[in-house]
Every structure is written in structure tokens, then in C-alpha cells.
Amino acid sequence: MSDVGPDLYAGLERAAKVATLLVASDLDGALAEFTLDPRDTTPAPGGMEALRRLAALPATHVVVVSGRDVRTLRQLTGVGSADPILLIGSHGGESSDPTVTVGAPLDRGQKALLDELSEQVAELVEHHPGARLERKHAAVTVHTRGLSEDSAAATLAEAELLGSDRAEVRVISGKSVVELSVSSADKGTALAALARHVDADATFYCGDDVTDEDAFRALDPLTGDVTVKVGSGPTAAAHRVGSVSDVVAALEQLLALREAAVRAS
């Protein structure tokens, strides 16, 4: 038994024994604590190490799934092109491995729309000191972490309005963030496609925000999948942990169980 709790431990124990296992996690809020500046994000000690060791085991596939673009994910996680860990960026719109297709590339119209949205968001941020803009592969994001509650609410409401009347723009509201995406890709579709690609018998996934709910709904605990919500709030996940350090503990426990299963096989 471990400190992850008996129900989650039982799920990890079952998943560790399957023939082919897919291990996936969000970055921000799951593998890494939030920072005022999203460029300063650093994975918590132990998490990436556990993922690398899992990826080195037979029939064990590891992926980080994030709203960040793949280029930024490489910088923040330290995962290189020769690394066995796959990176899925832009909520499922990008893959670090060209042989793994999880989303369609942006067309000319989508790229032009993204440029237009970026200009509009840049103007918005100028009028709200402390708000930050992040340009991604298929989206532009407004971050308000660190702002007063009233200032953050006003900024995010204005950001939502920029895309609310445009059918081709997906407005994603999360924790201290609003993202305007020109892609319909989501983490659930990407994770399901990846599970089929590797022929996974079970998938582990943990995440903390609204976009992770797509992944939770795409997986099925009744067939052996393990879904873990980080933090409070309503969720479709079967399990819940309270913090990033709890995610690291769960990954380390899964690693120990998977290593034991490999030795016993």
C-alpha cells in the first residue's frame, strides 16, 4: 500500500499488470505547479524522472498532453527529439512524433484567423496591466494569474467576448486563463487515438483543468483505465488527488508496480 489512497492504489495495481500500458499526464497543474509567468514553469522533482523510467519499460508508452505547443513543451520538460516520451501539444492538435497523427494541421484560413485573434488579444492585454499573452500553435491565450479578482474577471470576460460570436473559434475558459483556439482538437480525441495507435490495454491520465475533462470522458475506468483529477471541482475522473506532489507520488507508485509486473512476467 502507498500514501496515494486505497482506491487509487488498486487502480494503479490493475493497470500496472496489463500487457500494454499508456501513461499520460497534463503538464501545468499536474506535473508542474502554476507560476505567474507561464514561461517559468518547471516540472516538480520526481515526476519527469518517473515518466522516463516508465518509458524505458517494455510495452509502456508515455506521453505528456498539454495545451502548450510542442516547441514550448520541449523547453519546459527537457524532453528531446530522441527521448522515448511523446509530447502532444495544443490540446491534441500537435505531436512531437511525425509518425503519430492526432490532429489535422492548420489551413491558411485558420492561420489568418489566429493572427487576427493575436492582434486583438495583444490590444486587450495592453489595457490590463499584469495580464499576459501566450501565442500557441493553434491558439492565443490570456493569463491573469497574480491579478486582483476583479481585474482578472474583467480581463477574462473581455477575452471570452473576442471569440464568443465566432463559430470557428473555440473559447476555452480555465483557471486564470482564457484560450481562443482555431482548432477543434481536444485531449480526449487525441488520447483515444494514441491509445488505439499503441494498442493500449489500459491508460493512466491525470490533469487538473477543464480541458482535461475531455480526456477523462474519453477513458473508461470499467475497462481498466485510471483517471485522476488534481484539485477541487466537479470532474468525470474516477479518482482525485490534492496536489502536484500527489501526482508525483502516484507516478512513482505506478512505476514501482509496473517494474514488479515486468519482473514477474
Feature map (PLM): residue ranges:
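Asp-based phosphoryl-transfer active-site loop
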Residues: 16-39, 64, 191
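Active-site phosphate-binding/coordination module
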Residues: 42-135
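Short amphipathic alpha-helices and their capping/turn segments at secondary-structure boundaries
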Residues: 3-19, 73-79
